[in-house]
Every structure is written in structure tokens, then in C-alpha cells.
């Protein structure tokens, strides 16, 4: 949590309390279903929340922006971004019902009013969004192929509308 405060110095008290609440909520859910690797739950803030917030270091979404989180799993990167950008609208989608249930419960418990959730693949989502975000949900070429239809043409942010994917590991095969 301290790293979040260090990198994001202008958090409100509400945002701080929302971020602080995530640890207990994810631990509780992780005891019921495997939301985050059991070996990695102690690194929740650095490996999952702060990683999700890396997007905010390249763009500060304009109030009113609409963001689609594809393959959200337990709510990453959507929930941390929704905390940071309370004046933006977030739709979190995932095929797995139990993961959507986790993300919905957590977003409700911390009082997020700017998050909607839907159990579906992005192929089924017809809405238009300023940005599509994703965190290690699928190969880039597949993400681009199935979600580019969801990127709105009308611009309202400093960066052009598009797809922002957080990836890790060896991306050689995806870059080819």
C-alpha cells in the first residue's frame, strides 16, 4: 500500500480507504476460490494493484471516459483503475462467472459506483469505449482482433483511443 501512496500522491481519503480494503477482501475471496495465486497473495499491492495502475502513468483518463476491461478475472486492471478514476465509467467483462462474482462483490464492498460487470467474452460486447484495457488475458493479436470493434472513434483524451494491454514474460512469439 505504501508504494501506491508513493507513486500516486494525490489520492483522496476515500481512495486510500478503498485501496486499503482490497487486501482483506481479496484474501477472503482467495480462501474460497483461486482468484490470485496463493503464493502471490502477499504481493497483492505490488504485483496486481500497482501493476494495474501502471496504465495511469501513461494516461490520465478524462472524466466521462468509458473503459472496457477485457478478461478482468478478479477485477484487474479495472477495479484499481476505477478507484483512481472515479469520474470514468468501467465495464469489466470475463467469461468466468465466479471471477465476475468476486469482482462484483469487491467493487460493491468498497463502494465503487462507476463499475459495471458482465459475464461474457469481449466478442459479445457491442458497446463503444475510449479504451480497452487488459492484463495478460490473451495474446495481443487475438485481443486486437476481437476488441478493436469496441474502440470509439470520437476522441476525448490526451492519447488517441485504443487498446492498452499489460503483458509480461517473453513476448517474442506475440511480436512475430
Regions found by a protein language model. Name each.
Residues 74-87:
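Conserved SAM-binding loop of SAM-dependent methyltransferases across substrates and taxa
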Amino acid at each position: 500500500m505504501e508504494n501506491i501512496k508513493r507513486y500516486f500522491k494525490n489520492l483522496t481519503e476515500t481512495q486510500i480507504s478503498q485501496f486499503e480494503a482490497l487486501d482483506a477482501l481479496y484474501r477472503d475471496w482467495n480462501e474460497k476460490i483461486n482468484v490470485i495465486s496463493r503464493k502471490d497473495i502477499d504481493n497483492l499491492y505490488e504485483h496486481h494493484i500497482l501493476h494495474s495502475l501502471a496504465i495511469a502513468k501513461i494516461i490520465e483518463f478524462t472524466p466521462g471516459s468509458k473503459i472496457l476491461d477485457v478478461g478482468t478475472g478478479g477485477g484487474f486492471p479495472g477495479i484499481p483503475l476505477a478507484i483512481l478514476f472515479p469520474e470514468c465509467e468501467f465495464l469489466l467483462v470475463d467469461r468466468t462467472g465466479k471471477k465476475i462474482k468476486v469482482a462484483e462483490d469487491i467493487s460493491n464492498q468498497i463502494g465503487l459506483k462507476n463499475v459495471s460487470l458482465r459475464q461474457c467474452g469481449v466478442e459479445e460486447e457491442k458497446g463503444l469505449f475510449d479504451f480497452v484495457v487488459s492484463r495478460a488475458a490473451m495474446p495481443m493479436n487475438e485481443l486486437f482482433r476481437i476488441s478493436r470493434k469496441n474502440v470509439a472513434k470520437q476522441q476525448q483524451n490526451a492519447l488517441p483511443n485504443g487498446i492498452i494491454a499489460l503483458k509480461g514474460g517473453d513476448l517474442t512469439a506475440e511480436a512475430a
